[in-house]
Amino acid sequence: MFDPETLRTFIAVAETGSFSKAAERLCKTTATISYRIKLLEENTGVALFFRTTRSVTLTAAGEHLLCQARDWLSWLESMPSELQQVNDGVERQVNIVINNLLYNPQAVARLLAWLNERYPFTQFHISRQIYMGVWDSLLYEGFSLAIGVTGTEALANTFSLDPLGSVQWRFVMAADHPLANVEEPLTEAQLRRFPAVNIEDSARTLTKRVAWRLPGQKEIIVPDMETKIAAHLAGVGIGFLPKSLCQSMLDNQQLVSRVIPTMRPPSPLSLAWRKFGSGKAVEDIVTLFTQRRPEISGFLEIFGNPRS
């Protein structure tokens, strides 16, 4: 009933409002077009067009069919290529989770453009998670690949890892903060007087990692790195920032870096993917990272020197 030729004919008549104009568009005779529409109406059991001597217009049923017909025709026309892609080992859907520390909208867009050009029938889903929330997505939510899991060892032997680099940290505050010019190292008693600005771990199943905060110290939780940086600049509170993200603000004296009793060690991050069952799209993403291709360079800017 709804074969490609019938759908093309119906859409052409609906869009031109004329059997003769539809015939011209499809290089068919008017009689052929009229017969196909008549047969379609007989098979569906409803009138799809109001006919006058000058034009044809859609009935309510015809309007409904037109909304569906375009999608059906597009699906039918793309199906051979989709089936070939599946036969070639290409995934129907790839879910990618990215660590908040590495998340870069321009880098994400560049990667998606590269992938979409090569795998036009694959659905890509991007998620942004924090700390152990990245591993959580891989282990419990069916994600295919993670850009920036914490550590250099897999939490399960079903995953492969490629170390990307280590994030270096600086303890910062606004340049006009009361502690900005106090003798170093700052004491816990001095630090405890001011709020710690943190981003909460997004893990749902795994144990959340606790960010820097002293016992009894007020904590302000913000949703992302952009807000955390803005809060430090506004003098709202104190805390650690990745060196590469705050260096320009340290250089122009918007922020100052101070030494505290317990400095945060570097945080190693890795690419992680499933050892078994990965398709060609995931394999290509892994290759981009292991070969440090330009297409993924935006994700590695935070490290300064990748693999460090």
Curated annotation (Swiss-Prot):
Residues 2-59 form the HTH lysR-type domain. It holds the Pfam family LysR_substrate. Residues 19-38 bind DNA. The keyword Transcription regulation applies. GO terms for molecular function: DNA binding; DNA-binding transcription factor activity. Keywords: Activator, DNA-binding, Transcription, Transcription regulation. The keyword Ubl conjugation does not apply. Gene3D superfamilies: 3.40.190.290, Winged helix-like DNA-binding domain superfamily/Winged helix DNA-binding domain. InterPro entries: LTTR, LysR_subst-bd, Tscrpt_reg_HTH_LysR, WH-like_DNA-bd_sf, WH_DNA-bd_sf. It comes from the Bacteria. Coiled coil: none annotated. SUPFAM superfamilies: Periplasmic binding protein-like II, Winged helix' DNA-binding domain. Signal peptide: none annotated. Belongs to the LysR transcriptional regulatory family. Positive regulator essential for the expression of allD operon. Binds to the allD promoter. NCBIfam families: PRK10094.1. This is HTH-type transcriptional activator AllS. It comes from Escherichia coli O6:H1 (strain CFT073 / ATCC 700928 / UPEC).
